[in-house]
Amino acid sequence: MKKDRFLIGILVFIAVLVVAAVALFFVRGEEQAYGPEDTPDGVLKNYALAIQNMDYERAYTYLAERDGKPTFETFQQSFLTRQLDTSNSTLQIGEVYESGTNSAWAEVSVIYAGTGLFDTGWSSNDRAILVRQDGAWKITYLPYPYWGWEWYTPTPMPVKP
């Protein structure tokens, strides 16, 4: 009889944990909203969120107008064909440093999800580079998988013998 009460107590405790986990899942399941675009970190957050939401038109607007900018079709295809695959990663934005009034860089970490039960994943630290164009912050560099290696890369000139 005493063992039955103990077992029932354990089962009730487990049931309460399951109900709490399901409730938290549905409460926190709301969609993230875009933030302000007047700061470098706001632009980086909105770019990453647009990529996550597959809103490639919006994400493309955050790219700087410079030589080597990919066409919209190239940009979109990079994500649709999974050349750039952000499905198992997230972008964490750290400190932002403005140098002057027209350029900034931010410390960023790309955090990759683990692939197994005991694999906690890994992260890669890098930086994002932004410039101010026509009063708006635009991105000129982000680490892979949020950026194509060939974007904004100058075309090499052939060496004359």
Predicted regions mapped to residue ranges:
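Short solvent-exposed beta->alpha transition segments
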Residues: 42, 46, 56-107, 111-112, ...
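Generic cytosolic/nucleocytoplasmic N-terminal low-complexity/intrinsically disordered segments
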Residues: 1-2, 101
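Alpha-helix initiation/capping motif
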Residues: 2-4, 71, 142
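Exposed beta-sheet edge and beta->alpha loop/turn motif
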Residues: 99-161
